[in-house]
A protein has these predicted regions:
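Short hydrophobic beta-strand that contains or immediately precedes a catalytic carboxylate
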Residues: 1-5
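Conserved DEDDh/DEDDy metal-dependent 3′-5′ exonuclease domain
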Residues: 6-141
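Acidic two-metal-ion nuclease catalytic site recognized across multiple nuclease folds
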Residues: 134-155
């Protein structure tokens, strides 16, 4: 199981970065680096590997357009929260607040930084890893509830 987060940056030429997280390791793929394409395409196409994220419809379309491969095995946490009764779109920050009653701080500087840069800064790498890991924690916490697991399996 992996968490999928895309960083698009300020320009509309993204996505530039895809980050995945397991419970122990974050993986950050720079999409402008051709060396990252083969392992990334394998992960995206593998239906047996769950990719967790928020509001993934547009991300899947962007990846399909960029690589010509339909990403499979996605679990969209926004859809789970909607089925749980939340009317507004729930993103990562709101999900952390709902599930853990904690604030998830995101650096505005890192959010708005140049994700298309050939070399990412340490703050960008930390931001990307934290984003993916926080989403994984939300999913794992929700997965402890049998009713929510039923919702996940229906989607």
């Amino acid at each position: 199981m992996l968490v999928l987060i895309l960083e698009k940056g300020a320009a509309n030429h993204g996505p530039h970065v895809v980050q995945f997280s397991t419970e122990h390791t974050a993986y950050i793929f720079q999409l402008d680096n051709p060396e990252s394409h083969n392992p990334l395409l394998y992960l995206l196409a593998a239906e047996n590997i769950k990719k967790i994220g928020f509001d993934l419809t547009s991300d899947r379309k962007l990846l399909l357009r960029k690589f010509g491969v339909l990403p499979r095995g996605f679990v969209d946490l926004c859809r789970i929260f909607k089925r749980m009764g939340y009317r507004s779109t729930v993103g990562l920050r709101a999900a952390v607040a709902i599930v853990f009653n904690e604030q998830f701080h995101k650096s505005k500087h890192a959010t708005m930084s140049n994700w298309g840069s050939p070399i990412l800064s340490d703050s960008q790498l930390i931001y990307a890893a934290n984003d993916a890991f926080a989403a994984l924690r939300v999913y794992l916490s929700l997965s402890k509830d049998a009713d929510i697991v039923t919702l996940i399996n229906k989607i």
